[in-house]
Amino acid sequence: MIYLLRRRNLGKGSCNAIVASSTTGIGVFRSDLYYPPEADLVFRWGCTAPVRATSILNKVEAIHVVSDKLEFRKVLDTQGLCPKTWFQEEDVKFPAVVRPRTHHQGRRLWVCQDRPSLRAAISRCAEDFYASELINKTAEYRVFVVSGRVACVARKFPANPDAVAWNVYQGGRFENVRWDDWPLPVIKVAVRAFLLSGLDFGGVDIMVLGPKAYVLEINSAPSLTSPYRQRCFTKAFDWIVQKGKGFLPLGTRENYRKYIHPAIIERISDE
């Protein structure tokens, strides 16, 4: 038995789309409705419920790593992959963006211009906080990675380009990026960050200013709202079912072929 394991209110549409187009019989279970059956292979879709399986993709520990935005930001900061970030109030430089340890969907974000506004933002964080430099980004991408290779890339177009958080749940849209148009500096940084996470698959959020790409976070249950992205993920997951899990080495060409997942090489029409 092979299935996706999701939790309530997370990943229903994405998981059902993968199941519908899988050629290897991938199923799906919701952790709060059924006790997950013993399986040969389980893909954890942001779900850390107990499960018995011979092989598991996205270990509980890795999901916890990226869900703790503060601790993972420390990892990214030490590697120079994210905006300059501060973890102590006295170190913060302005303007700065303050966020709590855990957050999602572009919520719980405060832009601070001075010490009083910083203290007010910190007081709104019931837990620890981190603050990062405010980047006037010109573009933002989500890079979908499976087994260390890129399955697809989407660019975010916000409803309000002046907003700090470009989150599609608050308006705006994703548009698929064609292979030849993949921004290679973004792809390179995304793969580096992904390999630090311990995940087997996920969505890496990247913002861009000039030639510089900055990692924001990694999602262990990336929303697949496009039929194209759904098919890309399904192809990559079916590849794992047929050939086994494990990280795939990068190619040698200095173009998209260096990074693209081998399951995606066959042309998929962009919808």
Q: How should these model regions be labeled?
A:
Residues 2, 150-151, 213-214:
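Hydrophobic residues embedded in beta-strands of well-ordered beta-sheets
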Residues 2-90:
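Conserved N-proximal alpha/beta basic substrate-recognition cap immediately N-terminal to
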Residues 26-29, 135-138, 198-201:
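Short solvent-exposed loop/turn micro-motifs enriched in small/polar/acidic residues
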Residues 41-43, 96-99, 143-145, 212-226:
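A short beta-strand motif that forms the metal-chelation/ATP-contact edge
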Residues 63, 72, 96-120, 139-142:
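Glycine-rich phosphate-binding loop of ATP-grasp-fold ATP-dependent ligases
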Residues 110-194:
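Phosphate-binding site of ATP-dependent enzymes
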Residues 181, 195, 199, 208-271:
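C-terminal active-site "lid" helix and adjoining low-complexity regulatory extension at the edge
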Residues 204-206:
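Hydrophobic residue at the +6 position relative to the catalytic HRD Asp in the kinase catalytic loop
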